[in-house]
């Protein structure tokens, strides 16, 4: 269970203070589809970022499974994001030169999962979103809706407890939006899904709870949740492990990036070589000119020696 207690957040630019969230409190069930509605600047995305650990609150508390995050360090937030949260954004954020399967596997690669296990999990996640037969396509060979489904598969491959979606249908047409929303609704049967949207029709049709924000304050909540003593379980701290990528894995990904962009790599190398050679020639020419001038000065002075005579 996720509990947001009296969260406040301000953004400061010089003397200007923008209050994004003002004493926001919200209790979220383990399995529900929550839609956060509100106009631009109401604090929707800020709230989503705080839930996902992408932003820090100024005061209040975010309680995860009974554990306060007030004393969380950077490594705790990193582990929380990588193991508990799945992110789906309006922009798909897929790596264009990688296949669909490789894009989904990347989330597990960062978590240090072995190749065999991550391949199996990635295929299962893509099957779940209906893309099991398009594993080896690249993002530029897919439609917007398909790319968003790849992004959802990537978010689900780590089996997160919470899925956060920021305007997941913002760049899609109405028919494709319905497909994505159907998928998110299905996902919400097994975990908590929190979606930010400007579309009240989609929210009312698919979400089982709508929270409306305005000027950083919750105006309405269609299905509020107040945990009682029976609902509140003893605090449990989940050992989520450390997320890391080995040096060899990072080197392999970099090499694949260079290999798939051969023309750009060659042109960049050629341009860099010309630049280095040009600098070397300028330095050599400058050194040669200075040496020539010095030799000329010495020869001139030797031909016309200066004579100093004393008078008096």
Per-region residue spans from a language model:
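Helix-to-loop junction immediately C-terminal to a conserved catalytic motif
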Residues: 52
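Conserved ABC ATPase "signature" region
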Residues: 67-68, 105, 109, 116-133
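Conserved ABC ATPase signature
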Residues: 79, 138-148
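Conserved signature/switch motifs of ABC ATPase nucleotide-binding domains
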Residues: 82, 137-140, 157-158, 189
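Conserved catalytic loops of ABC-family nucleotide-binding domains
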Residues: 83, 183-195
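Catalytic Walker B motif of ABC-type/P-loop ATPase nucleotide-binding domains
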Residues: 163-166
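Alpha-helical transmembrane segments
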Residues: 264, 277-307
């Amino acid at each position: 269970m996720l509990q947001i207690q009296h969260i406040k957040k301000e953004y400061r630019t010089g003397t200007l203070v923008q209050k994004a969230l003002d004493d926001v409190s919200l209790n979220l069930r383990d399995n529900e589809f929550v839609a956060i509605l509100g106009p631009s600047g109401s604090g929707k995305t800020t709230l989503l970022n705080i839930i996902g650990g992408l932003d820090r609150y100024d005061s209040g508390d975010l309680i995860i499974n009974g554990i306060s995050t007030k004393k969380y360090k950077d490594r705790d937030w990193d582990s929380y994001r990588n193991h508990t949260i799945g992110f789906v954004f309006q922009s798909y954020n897929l790596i264009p030169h990688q296949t669909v399967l490789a894009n989904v596997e990347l989330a597990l690669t960062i978590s240090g999962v072995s190749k065999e296990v991550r391949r199996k999990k990635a295929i299962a996640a893509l099957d779940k979103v209906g893309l099991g037969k398009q594993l080896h396509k690249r993002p530029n060979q897919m439609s917007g809706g398909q790319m968003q489904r790849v992004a959802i598969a990537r978010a689900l491959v780590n089996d997160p407890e919470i899925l956060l979606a920021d305007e997941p249908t913002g760049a899609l047409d109405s028919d494709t939006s319905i497909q994505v929303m159907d998928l998110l609704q299905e996902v919400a049967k097994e975990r908590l899904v929190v979606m930010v949207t400007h579309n009240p029709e989609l929210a009312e049709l698919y979400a089982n709870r709508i929270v409306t924000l305005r000027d950083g304050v919750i105006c309405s909540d269609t299905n509020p949740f107040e945990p009682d003593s029976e609902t509140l379980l003893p605090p449990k701290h989940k050992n989520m492990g450390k997320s890391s990528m080995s040096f060899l894995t990072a080197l392999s990904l970099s090499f694949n990036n260079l290999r798939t962009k051969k023309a750009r790599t060659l042109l960049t190398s050629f341009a860099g070589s010309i630049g280095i050679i040009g600098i070397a020639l300028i330095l050599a020419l400058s050194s040669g000119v200075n040496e020539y001038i010095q030799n000329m000065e010495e020869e001139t002075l030797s031909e016309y020696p200066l004579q100093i005579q004393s008078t008096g």
